[in-house]
């Protein structure tokens, strides 16, 4: 085994040289249209002046010891709470989504005095021991020492799932139910409003906390600032990260209701060496202020772009029956065939389009400000990659002949 290398779970698909706007270039100079955006990180494209300017112009302290105070921390907490769903009231600093989820689970344990958690099967909530424990059960098969008492409810989210949730909560030993309001990892899975309302009722009835994991969906991705808004969710705890700095700095946060926050502040441990680094805070403040100031226009433009994606995808000829799921610019195309989905993502990348194969679903996650022409280019590449093999071969030979002639 070679020394001095970065550990990998699998071989990387791309060696990145640079990024700008809606595009990424690899080390060979090939240009890719990015409909992945770091998996919900770059909401406003790469190298956006809105975030780059405060990052370059920052004149604050290099670092603030977590035991000290730093006024911009309070500014950011106040701004986050002002746009978050009620009853969230207090912010806890984190370096990213995994740490934010860890804090959320710790807060639930402390506040309720219970030791068990309930989540959706095949979900993803981070790479810490706690996040892996409430994620997909395959994690437990590979790692035998994850947290005990983490139970799963299998989709679809129907009456059967509700009955399972009620049985689990009735024991009054579940600290929290955690889910993404709109699950990106489950292929943009959108629960019915009635399902969510009943889950919240059951959580309140059995004094189980509701944790909304908005690490991927927060800050506009699904067509509202937070996916919770669309489903009428009033979470006890919410986690955010990813797009909060548009990829320019690492940051996450756990937001809690006042009662949960009091319990956590009194009995919890939440020291974070690099949580809310001063430079990242400056960038996050610029990002969120832009969102708040331009929310109406941004979301209206997104809605129109979302409709365009939906219309194109629903009429697109795929090699498999496809279910198209679109919420804002969180887009999932479910083929019920993991192998086909993986190959389609590979064909897209070969043609210069970056997407994500999540099991049986192909995810498209473009920047929220993607223009119509760029959206059309990406969808044209997808249509070409998804076309019948004979048609793809014909196009490839024509392109080769044209290149040779020139």
Predicted feature locations:
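Conserved N-terminal phosphate-binding loop of PLP-dependent enzymes in the Aspartate aminotransferase
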Residues: 1-406
